[in-house]
Amino acid sequence: MIHGFLKACTVSPALRVADCAFNTQQTIAAMQRAALDGAQLAVFPELGLTGYTCGDLFFQQPLQRAAAKGLAAVLEASAGLDLVALVGLPVAVDGKLYNCAAVVCHGKLLGLVPKTHLPNYGEFYEKRQFNPAPAGVRTLR
């Protein structure tokens, strides 16, 4: 930090719908570039490990497992970086699916932040796939 400020960046990597392996590679490469450029905080797209437009594929176990595997790879890659990254992925907890931002730093998962306000109009059908963050709940188990 310089004078109380940190360098932050938003990242828009090339993504492929439902191709978690490709999206994970793109995310890791962008994290490494951001850290080399001196960023201390990198914010990635919503549902970036799966792609936003997976629709009902979000309910499929193979996609959920691939996203979790991608997050594990991101965690491992972050171990040597001086960077906090927010990476988007779907997370299933107790039979409910959440649209989450994973907070990653130095090889650790610092938290999962489920989306609170889900749009349900026009091309946005998030309430079909996802549950909103439970009101007043600070921890998902």
Language-model region placement:
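Enzyme catalytic cores with a strong preference for nitrogen-chemistry domains
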Residues: 1-141
